[in-house]
A protein has these predicted regions:
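Non-catalytic accessory regions of SAM-dependent methyltransferases
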Residues: 1-43, 47-50
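Conserved hydrophobic residues forming the short capping helix/wall of the S-adenosyl-L-methionine
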Residues: 15, 109, 158, 233, ...
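Conserved AdoMet
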Residues: 32-108
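Active-site beta-alpha loop architecture of Rossmann-like, nucleotide-cofactor-dependent enzymes
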Residues: 72, 195-198, 250
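Conserved SAM/SAH cofactor-binding pocket of Class I
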Residues: 97-202, 227-228
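C-terminal beta-strand of the catalytic ATP-binding
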Residues: 194, 283-284
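Mobile active-site "lid"/loop adjacent to the S-adenosyl-L-methionine
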Residues: 194-224
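Conserved Class I SAM-dependent methyltransferase catalytic core
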Residues: 220-283
């Protein structure tokens, strides 16, 4: 019988040989999930013996990972802004880059409009909604996505993070007119699809083959959703409101130009932790 440390080392070595960059971290996550433990608990129990059931589960997880499936989809959970998030193949896996968007929402609202009404457009898993709701406990939020299956995950995350009393989920198309009665907002935050259609096939296979293409494909120029959201949703902003976008690399200038052409008073750009221009803030 193997110890948890044996299982971890074997998993780590297999991932390393297969070229997985974060092989040690991923090995810990996979073994911990298979054992129904947190990573902290796993590290505490490394010298304890595992069970055949756990070993079989790790073998299955490892095979899936070596085929390219992302760890988040294997475990069904991921962390965003310090919060637990359920994920599956119906939603994009939350990225650290998107935490810059949450930071921008806080920058706009903290000390100015703590009880703001915030719209999360193209909400996917609801990670932005949950993070903003957790960080700004007086806000009221609306989470919108076209995908019914994504909204199921969003609702589950809202409930898991105890935000159901402050969040409404709605199904709507970000590239069309807003539904009647949705109201107005102090902030509209959006991480829309922004990968150029022609670049989808160049993405890493863990993204290209497993994450939902419709949540990645931003049209021929990657800007389709930005154009539509500015056109159709700008009218929902309250006076002095802000439209805050996550953008792809080298898209910030184009999106700022669109905002200014649409009559926004100002446009600011914020960089992510890697120094990439990741967020654009348009102010009415």
């Amino acid at each position: 019988m193997k110890t948890y440390n044996d299982l971890y080392l074997n998993t780590r070595n297999m991932l390393k040989r297969s070229g997985v960059e974060a092989y040690a971290q991923e090995a810990r996550i996979l073994v911990a999930c298979a054992a129904d433990k947190t990573v902290t608990q796993l590290l505490r129990d490394l010298n304890l013996y595992t069970t055949p059931a756990v070993e079989n589960t790790v073998t299955d997880y490892l095979a899936r990972r070596l085929r390219g499936e992302p760890v988040a989809y294997i475990t069904g959970t991921w962390e965003f802004y310090g919060l637990p998030m359920k994920v599956n193949a119906d939603v994009l896996i939350p990225r650290p880059d998107t935490e810059t968007l949450v930071d921008a929402v806080k920058e706009v609202l903290v000390g100015y409009k703590m009880d703001a009404r915030v719209l999360d457009l193209c909400c996917g898993s609801g990670c932005i909604t949950c993070a903003v709701g957790h960080e700004l406990p007086a806000t009221k939020l609306v989470a919108v996505d076209l995908s019914a299956s994504a909204l199921e995950i969003c609702r589950a995350n809202i409930a898991m993070n105890r935000l159901s009393s402050r969040v409404i989920c709605m199904q709507a198309d970000a590239t069309a007119s807003p539904p009647l009665g949705i109201g107005t907002f102090d902030v509209i935050a959006s991480n829309p699809p922004y990968v150029k259609s022609g670049e989808i096939q160049t993405l890493d296979r863990s993204v290209r083959d497993y994450e939902p293409i419709w949540a990645l494909d931003g049209g021929k120029d990657g800007l389709r959703f930005y154009k539509a959201i500015i056109k159709y949703w700008k009218s929902l902003l309250r006076p002095e409101g802000a439209l805050i976008f996550e953008v792809g690399e080298n898209q910030a200038d184009d999106v700022c130009d669109m905002l200014m052409a649409a009559g926004f008073a100002s446009c600011a750009v914020r960089k992510d932790a890697r120094g990439v221009e990741r967020v654009v803030i348009g102010r009415i």
